[in-house]
Amino acid sequence: MKQSLLSVLTKKSLRLLAALFLVVTSVFSLPQAAQAFPIYAQQAYDSPREANGRIVCANCHLAAKPTQVEVPQAVLPDTVFEAVIKIPYDTDAQQVLGSGDLGPLNVGAVLMLPDGFQIAPDDRIPEKMKEEINGVFYQKYKPDTDNVIVVGPLSGADHQEIIFPVLSPDPATDPNIHFGKYSVHAGGNRGRGQIYPTGDKTNVNAVTSPAAGLVSSVSENSVTITTNDGQTVTESIPAGLEVVVSEGQAVADGAPLSSDPNVGGFGQKDTEIVLQSGTRIKWLMVFFSAIMISQTLLVLKKKQVEKVQAAEMNF
């Protein structure tokens, strides 16, 4: 009987230890908020570009800001070239951080290349280009998407231009690649977003009145409103935001109660690139050369005929 009881207790203890081990393992294996911050989109979307053409970064960075992308008009197979995403903004601007303090803006970018294009291996990147991209870490959007690259967050003051060293594919070694014109999609953001992936608002939003009424009290971190139907509602004002209403002021539904702290935003740009065949270029040059030679010979022949005709007329 004692042995049976001891056996039961031993089994229960082992099960308890196993369950505890699984709980601890799962806690440490979950992505932490600080680690997940640069890759919110990667966790939530299979592709950074929606069916309507919009890049998903715009779902959290609501303000529209300009972004530019520069790529060569055409590239040869198996060559390294620069793709540049420009994210301009006023470097004197400061954003509201999560703590409510003011701080410098950071930037991030996504580059969607045609199939087969990818970030160039380190041994293929020229030394001059390495100096220009020093400190930039390039990450695949998904493990199996070599042609979709994300970067950031980076210091905005030092990275208003982000250079991507790109290696073009070679149709001679990959039968799935063909010469032709392809689309390139780029997106760039500066500053913090207004929406978390959960749908909750960040503190980079103006606080608005939930209903029409009169402001009954104002403090540094809250505004109380007596609505037109006699109810009282209190809106919290996150740290770093400035209250723009005063007691006794009438406010409409949706009217701002605080300043708008957002100084950032997102922008996207589409362009095209041609994967050009070197053989085609050579034959094109031969064709143009043949035309030029033919035209030259025709001109010479015409002058010769004119001389003969002039001689016959004089005779």
UniProtKB/Swiss-Prot annotation:
It comes from the Bacteria. PANTHER family: CYTOCHROME F, PTHR33288. It comes from Acaryochloris marina (strain MBIC 11017). The 4 large subunits of the cytochrome b6-f complex are cytochrome b6, subunit IV (17 kDa polypeptide, PetD), cytochrome f and the Rieske protein, while the 4 small subunits are PetG, PetL, PetM and PetN. The complex functions as a dimer. PROSITE patterns: CYTF. Binds 1 heme group covalently. It holds the Pfam family Apocytochr_F_C. InterPro entries: Cyt-f_TM (IPR024058), Cyt_f (IPR002325), Cyt_f_lg_dom (IPR024094), Cyt_f_lg_dom_sf (IPR036826), Rudment_hybrid_motif (IPR011054). This is Cytochrome f. One of its GO terms (cellular component) is plasma membrane-derived thylakoid membrane. Component of the cytochrome b6-f complex, which mediates electron transfer between photosystem II (PSII) and photosystem I (PSI), cyclic electron flow around PSI, and state transitions. It is found in: Cellular thylakoid membrane. Coiled coil: none annotated. The chain crosses the membrane at residues 281-301. Keywords: Electron transport, Heme, Iron, Membrane, Metal-binding, Photosynthesis, Signal, Thylakoid, Transmembrane, Transmembrane helix, Transport. Heme binds at residues 37, 57, 60-61. Its cofactor is heme. Belongs to the cytochrome f family.
